[in-house]
């Protein structure tokens, strides 16, 4: 698969730029860290070559200078807010993040509870952290926030917050999710630092939108697609244009809040170090795109994937999706047509040839497309998976990798003992059967060794797949899209 992004250059440039920003201030920088730190798969999809843990690796280059402060809102603790990608509550995710940071050698200094309320759930969480040896600090609700700047930047505002004691020049402020109070925590710390005579600084690190590529570049449009539920809109930064006469891309929320943030800087430090919200950022990703065409194509595919996901989510939930209108607009802006990708065309062609039965297609790294159809032994996704492995291994498509004799006992187990009504093998089941066959069958072993080559391949199904198949395909690193159609449309209940 072609690379469009130089990851090594990114790690070097990004860490160096943050060091330079630390040096601009009194050797103390509060860095608001947005987006996913450990597993930024969106970035790896739209910038081929970007590693999902690149931001973590960049921080590790600064680990002797850095400490982590994790922020969580008391309101999210009380409401037991759940992080959608992990399915765990925000308070548990704080513990997960602490383990993850410490596990790679990063120093976690403390946890800050924002919007503090002395509710039992909040106090219990605070006690739990203290019992684990994690220091906690409390920041409180400020009446009139964020518009009453004079009150906020005073002893009645930030002054009431506890000062978070930190030890290192770079303080990374991160959180389980948006709306936790990262920026407010940074600005509160600046207020207290200046009171103590330390001329600390603030910066913001977010990968998207990329400020120094065109507004309607597919990479930036793909970011809008990823945040369609938040209704974020990329815009030309008017403050940057006025200050420098140059265009830069930012998004609506940062642009809207900048006058308020700028006024806070002036009250805290006497003068704002920044002329625009873009100035506050430290993102160097745009400088590390080495093949623009590759990144454009990858981003166009991501927009299509986001659209199909929204269609399927709407089908599964039964609720109208407001995201779809935004995504349709983005499809038009990117000049995309649903149904034009080879995996869509060929999966539908197979389905039509088999009387409308479910079908699937996978596009391999060299551009070749292999398909799979529904049969008595295998579902379409499982069939496509085996055919892809055969193609990659140079095995004849007519050769059986797993014999019927090996599959039939598994079907008997499923239907006679495990209560399944579907005898066909799911993707995880056929892979287990293939690995068992590989012990005595060199052809099967050869096919099994190709699994890693499926990472990054696009796959399309003419029906919504089960959660078992979806999870397996995701774990293989493939990019799956499904038509918003159930295999049995007339049924009222559909197991996921």
Language model region names:
Residues 391-423:
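Short HxH-centered metal-ligating active-site micro-motif
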Residues 373-374:
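Short clusters of small/polar residues that mark proteolytic maturation junctions
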Residues 185:
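Hydrophobic positions on the alpha1 helix immediately C-terminal to the Walker A/P-loop
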Residues 377-393:
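A short, polar/charged loop-to-alpha-helix boundary motif
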Residues 182, 359-361:
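Transmembrane alpha-helical segments and their cytosolic interface motifs
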Residues 177-178:
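The conserved Walker
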Residues 1-173, 189-350, 354-357, 364-366, ...:
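Flexible phosphate-sensing "switch/lid" loops adjacent to ATP/NTP-binding sites
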């Amino acid at each position: 698969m072609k690379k469009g992004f130089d990851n090594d250059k990114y790690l070097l440039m990004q860490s160096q730029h943050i060091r330079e920003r630390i040096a601009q201030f009194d050797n103390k920088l509060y860095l608001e860290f947005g987006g996913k730190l450990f597993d930024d798969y969106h970035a790896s999809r739209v910038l081929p070559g970007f590693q999902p843990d690149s931001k973590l690796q960049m921080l590790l280059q600064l680990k002797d200078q850095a400490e982590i402060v994790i922020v969580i809102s008391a309101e999210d603790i009380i409401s037991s807010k759940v992080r959608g990608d992990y399915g765990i509550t925000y308070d548990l995710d704080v513990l997960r993040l602490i383990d993850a940071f410490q596990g790679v050698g990063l120093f976690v200094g403390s946890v800050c509870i924002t919007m503090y309320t002395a509710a039992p759930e909040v106090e219990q969480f605070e006690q739990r952290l203290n019992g684990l040896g994690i220091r906690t600090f409390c920041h409180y609700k400020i009446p009139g926030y964020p518009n009453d700047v004079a009150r906020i930047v005073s002893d009645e505002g930030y002054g009431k917050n506890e000062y978070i004691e930190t030890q290192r020049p770079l303080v990374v402020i991160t959180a389980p999710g948006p709306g936790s109070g990262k920026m407010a925590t940074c600005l509160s710390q600046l207020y207290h630092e200046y009171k103590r005579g330390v001329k600390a600084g603030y910066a913001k690190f977010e990968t998207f939108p990329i400020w120094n590529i065109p507004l309607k570049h597919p990479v930036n449009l793909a970011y809008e697609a990823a945040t369609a539920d938040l209704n974020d809109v990329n815009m030309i930064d008017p403050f940057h244009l006025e200050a420098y006469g140059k265009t830069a891309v930012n998004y609506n929320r940062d642009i809207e809040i900048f006058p308020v943030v700028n006024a806070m800087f002036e009250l805290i430090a006497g003068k704002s170090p920044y002329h625009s919200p873009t100035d506050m950022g430290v993102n160097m990703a745009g400088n590390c795109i080495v093949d623009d065409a590759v990144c454009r194509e990858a981003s166009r595919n991501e927009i299509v994937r986001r659209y199909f996901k929204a269609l399927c989510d709407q089908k599964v939930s039964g609720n109208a999706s407001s995201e779809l209108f935004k995504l349709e607009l983005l499809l038009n802006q990117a000049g995309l047509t649903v149904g034009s990708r080879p995996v869509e065309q060929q999966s539908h062609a197979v389905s039509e040839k088999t009387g409308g039965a479910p079908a699937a297609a996978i596009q391999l790294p060299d551009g070749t497309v292999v398909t799979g159809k529904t049969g008595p032994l295998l579902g379409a996704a499982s069939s496509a998976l085996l055919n892809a492995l055969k193609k990659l291994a140079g095995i004849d498509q007519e050769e059986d990798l797993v014999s019927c004799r090996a599959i039939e006992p598994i079907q008997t187990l499923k239907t006679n003992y495990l209560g399944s009504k579907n005898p066909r093998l799911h993707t995880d089941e056929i892979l287990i059967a293939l690995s068992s066959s590989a012990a005595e069958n060199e052809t099967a072993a050869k096919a099994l060794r190709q699994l890693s080559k499926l990472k990054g391949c696009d796959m399309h199904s003419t029906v919504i797949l089960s959660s078992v198949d979806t999870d397996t395909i995701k774990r293989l690193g493939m990019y799956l899209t499904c038509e918003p159609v159930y295999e049995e449309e007339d049924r009222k209940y559909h197991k996921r």
